[in-house]
Amino acid sequence: MKNILEVLVFASVLWGLTACSSSSSKEEEFEKEEEKVEEVVEFYKGADISWVTEMESKGHKFYNAAGKETECTALMKEYGMNAIRLRVWVDPSKHDNWCNKEDVLVKAKRAKALGMEVMIDFHYSDWWADPAKQNIPASWKGHSYEEMKKDLANHTKEVLQLMKSNGITPKWVQVGNETTNGMLWSVKTNEQGWEIKDENGNTIITESMGHATRNPEQYAGFFAAGYDAVKEIFPDAIVIVHLDNGFDSDLYDWNLGILTSNGAKFDMIGMSLYPYWAESYHGKTADQTINGCMANIKRVSAKYGCEVMIVETGMLCADEQGKL
């Protein structure tokens, strides 16, 4: 198995022009003409360290470059990170309850104590949710669309109220994780929770409640329910819609078009970008993927009038022999 370092790079990109005051002075007019108009970029550097408590329970330890044992969150800050991303699963009891709301609180408290910003990443599933699967939580199965909107809203508020009661104010909240194909739609899985594919390599959809292609209005309705729930607890939180393949402009127009045309709101667009796997999956070089993503960031920021953030990325940290 490849050695992989997964790092979350929060890059909040503010596209704007520098303000200039008018002047009748020729000298000032000359200086104004010579002034360079630059893009203003504010970076949040962070990591998704949601696994840290599970790793600690198994005896894993973390060390800085000097060989000093250091708690993982503190180590992230030592190396210049100023934000932490934490995923939330609804009922991960089949997976030892890691990433349930209580486990998230433990990690969020560490970040707060270090003065780091927190992003809460709702998966709205009992385990992993991504473009290939968005499995409906077991306790929500069989519910109607309206009932499931309430389930989603109540879960969102319950988790965020727990944060609030403990003095933690997330700066960002993801309503869904890589909802490229919607949210709250299920696929056939094995006992471990991994998707089972057909002979053509496609996942087998068993419930299409919030599938973006099959039920676009319901996908938008779920997102809107999550947005409103976040704002009820934290009115100033930045709500993110998170999609994968940040270089794919057609994908972003299609998915975000579903949301906006159905009245759903978002404050920020979050992107996943894995440039060093793009060649095998998408036939693009890493540079092509990165350049395409940067162009798409500028485009969607202007089109939808909001900031854009790379919320998920990853890269190899070692070669096949394990050499760093």
Where are these regions (language model features)?
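Bacterial Sec-dependent N-terminal signal peptides
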Residues: 13-38
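Short, solvent-exposed loop/turn segments at secondary-structure boundaries
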Residues: 60-61, 95-99, 281-288
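Short acidic, glycine/proline-rich loop/turn micro-motifs
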Residues: 57-60, 131-133, 185-188, 280-283, ...
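Sec-dependent signal peptide recognition
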Residues: 2-10
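Glycoside hydrolase catalytic-domain groove-lining segments
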Residues: 70-73, 77, 232-242, 246-323
